[in-house]
Structure formats: C-alpha cells, structure tokens
Amino acid sequence: MPLLSSSKLSMESRKEDSEGTAPAPPQKKLSCQCHHHCPEDSVNSTCSTDGYCFTIIEEDDSGGHLVTKGCLGLEGSDFQCRDTPIPHQRRSIECCTGQDYCNKHLHPTLPPLKNRDFAEGNIHHKALLISVTVCSILLVLIIIFCYFRYKRQEARPRYSIGLEQDETYIPPGESLKDLIEQSQSSGSGSGLPLLVQRTIAKQIQMVKQIGKGRYGEVWMGKWRGEKVAVKVFFTTEEASWFRETEIYQTVLMRHENILGFIAADIKGTGSWTQLYLITDYHENGSLYDYLKSTTLDTKGMLKLAYSSVSGLCHLHTGIFSTQGKPAIAHRDLKSKNILVKKNGTCCIADLGLAVKFISDTNEVDIPPNTRVGTKRYMPPEVLDESLNRNHFQSYIMADMYSFGLILWEIARRCVSGGIVEEYQLPYHDLVPSDPSYEDMREIVCIKRLRPSFPNRWSSDECLRQMGKLMMECWAHNPASRLTALRVKKTLAKMSESQDIKL
C-alpha cells in the first residue's frame, strides 16, 4: 500500500524528527512486527528489512480506525516516513530503526478532527460568500435594467395611441382599403395580421369623442389621413371587447352590411389598461340618430330595411367549406347598434353579446359575459325566461323579434301623403323611458301588446306591407317568426314592385 505520510519518530530518533528528517537507516537487517502488511514469506507476523519498521493509523470510510504495521525498504522510505497532510484523509505514521520489533511500541495518533472541519468549513464559507456576492451583483444588474426600462416607458407620451414612428410593417402609401383587400386575397379571411393591427393602433391620432355608452366611449380618429372609429372599452367590459374582437375576426365575416373591422389592441401599463376596437367610420352615426333627424321616402326606407336585414342574414347564415363561417346570433339588436353609411345603407355593429353555433359539436358558444341585452328590445321568451339557451335557433328567432321593432322605427319616418310621425322608440307610449323587466314583461308577455301602426299606413301599399312584415317578425311564438332570409326576399320583391333598385 502507498504510504505518503511522515513519521513521528521513536525515542532513538526524536532529534532527527525535530529537524524534519527520518531516523538513520539501520546498518544490518532489522526484524519488524507486521500486521495487515506482511509479506507472503513472513513467519509469526514478522518481516525483515534493511530500512525501517513502521506503524500507521488511519480512518476508514465508516469512521473506524485501522492500524497497520510492517517493514519499509530502504529505498524511498525516507520520503514515506515524512508526515505530509493529505486533504480529506485522517492518518498518521511513525517509523523506527533502534532495535528489532521496535514498531511494536509505536502508537501514532490521528490528527485532531477540528483541523479538517475548520478547513472544510472555511471552504464552505468561501463558497457561500462567492455565491452571495454573485447573486447580489446579478440582482443589482436586474434592478438597474428594470429601472431604466421603466424610465424609458415613462418618458413616452401618456396618450395611449399617440403617433409613433413604427411603420416597419406597413409600407408608406398603403391605405386601409389596400390592406384589407390584401388580407382578403391572402386566403385567411379573418382580417388583418395581428402585427399590422397593432401597428395601426399605435399610429392612430384621436380627434374627438363622438359617443359614450355603458361599454365605454367612441372616438373619431385618423390613420394616415383616413377617418376611423375607435371604440374604447372600460376595463370592466373586457369580456365584451374580447368577444366582439373574436366575432369580427371570424373567417368570412366581412360583409358590406356588417361594420368593417380594422384592428383591435390592448394598451396600458400595470396601473391602467385600455381596450381598443378600431372600425370603419360612418359620419351619419347610428340608425337611431339618423332617424331622429331625417325623414325618408319609400326608397330610403327600403334601402335602410333591406341593407339591415342583409347584414343580419349574413350573420345568421353558416357557411360550410374548408374555411367556413359559423352561424352567429346578435342578441342585442336595436337601432343604436346599426350604423348608417353615406350611401343610405346600413351596417350592423356592436357584436359584444353575439353567440356562435358550433356545427361540429352542435353546441352554442355563449360568451362569458355578465352584460345583457336592451330590455326594450327583448322578446317575450327572454322576458319570461322560457328561451332554450342550448338551442341556437332560439337566439336567431329572438333577433328577428328585435328586428321587427327596428322595421317599425324605420317605417314611422317614411313620408306618405305629406304625413310623417316624429321619431319614437318602440313602446314609447306603453313603458317609461328606462323600463324595467317587470314593465316590459307585463306589456309584451302578459298583455301581448306591440307598437301601434299609424292610420295612414293602411292607405299606402308599401307601408301596409311593411306593417305585415314586422308583425310576422315580432310574433309571440318564436316558431311563427320570419327568418332574416325570408324578410330579405320579401323586401327585394317590394322594391321590384315599386320599381326601386336597392
């Protein structure tokens, strides 16, 4: 076995030990006691050597003490008898040459345990110190990075969609119409790419507020000189924002009688958040606003009615193909949620409550939204809570009831015989300006009343047919109501009979 330790010398050689040297080698053969280190030809645990006798004690892996005795040859023994500490190993050796069997009386002792513990503890202490130092430096660097990033954000304008120099993804000269046509021709059919939407949102300049409702505010803005409408949702209306964005980006959703979707984005920091929905801008405003200030001739009435039901028909119709469109019900149809274009046609807006029909699973995808529709336009099955929420056709028929009321609003503003009524909301003469569920339930469900027709309608064929049409839309029994497609075809025939091109 290798012996790489030094000696504690016997009495005969203590002087040499104090000087750091091994005892002088014997002049003749020396007999030594051997134990655990006996040569094969040894007799009675005895060995002979021309060098030294030794005794060594060492600690094994289990913590026990192992004593070994034997002979060291002259060559190299001087080095082996020197006590050189070995890291992580406790051992000690003593050598002697004074007389035969002198190692019988050698009793080396192990070095104190505290020396090793101190060394190991010192190493652990250094490792801990280094680790703490490195972690502290990293933490300081992270804090500095976060601080400068925060200051950089704070230095930006607080106006959430101020003009920024971020036109990387939209080449100069591209109009909104160009971008939308490109997205449609690309085959995705689900609107502009998200990166383009975010870029547009950043570049919009807010001009003036044009409306405010329970969901938030509507602003007129500009993007590269083009007017756009920016719907800014309250943070409490995030579900409506998400749902409306999702519906607008449904494949094959774009239609001339559905409000044109441009972009959606979320702006803000940890302390404030704003939700934007950017759409086409229509300066005539809602159908409600338009009817309050504008009277109609027969052509104008039919254009408003036909274009509105065309948008509703597109919503209600599912398209089955590799990139199909699900059938969608609006659930909050009213004159304030229909916009009037410059050309006198309508487009349907505000899809925050819309539901989709998943044809693959035959399920209704209802938004997780606490908001409900407008009580004045609610059908009887919603007011008396008899609507089957798991049957998609129930929502379609509920939309048709609401659309019947919208037809009534439009028809009242059509001039016939030089007579026209002031604009009024449905049931204006039967319920308060802000009716409760109970008010509407009593009128619509219990008394089964509907808006009344002016006497002049009976003397005008077109208005008479309109009256018949709306009655078939707001029938008490949902199954008896006309579909949007049926209403669309009827209005088309009425236009032909009046020689009116829509």
From Swiss-Prot:
One GO cellular component term: plasma membrane
Which Gene3D superfamilies does the protein's record reference? CD59, Phosphorylase Kinase, domain 1, Transferase(Phosphotransferase) domain 1
Annotated segments matching region Disordered = 1-27
Record-listed ATP binding positions:
I210, G211, K212, G213, R214, Y215, G216, E217, V218, K231
Q: Which InterPro entries match?
A: Activin_recp, GS_dom, Kinase-like_dom_sf, Prot_kinase_dom, Protein_kinase_ATP_BS, Ser-Thr/Tyr_kinase_cat_dom, Ser/Thr_kinase_AS, Snake_toxin-like_sf
Catalytic reactions of this protein = L-threonyl-[receptor-protein] + ATP = O-phospho-L-threonyl-[receptor-protein] + ADP + H(+); L-seryl-[receptor-protein] + ATP = O-phospho-L-seryl-[receptor-protein] + ADP + H(+)
**What is one Pfam family matched by this protein?**
TGF_beta_GS
* Positions annotated as glycosylated: N44
Q: Where is the signal peptide?
A: 1-13
Q: Which residues lie on this side of the membrane: Extracellular?
A: 14-126
The record lists the membrane-crossing segments as 127-148
| SS bond partners | C32-C53, C34-C38, C47-C71, C81-C95, C96-C102
Ranges for domain Protein kinase? 204-494
Q: What is its EC number?
A: 2.7.11.30
Cofactor(s) this protein requires? Mg(2+); Mn(2+)
Q: What class of enzyme is it?
A: transferase
Role noted for this protein: On ligand binding, forms a receptor complex consisting of two type II and two type I transmembrane serine/threonine kinases. Type II receptors phosphorylate and activate type I receptors which autophosphorylate, then bind and activate SMAD transcription. Positively regulates chondrocyte differentiation.
Q: What name has this protein been given in UniProt?
A: Bone morphogenetic protein receptor type-1B
What taxonomic classification does the UniProt entry list for its organism? Answer: Eukaryota, Metazoa, Chordata, Craniata, Vertebrata
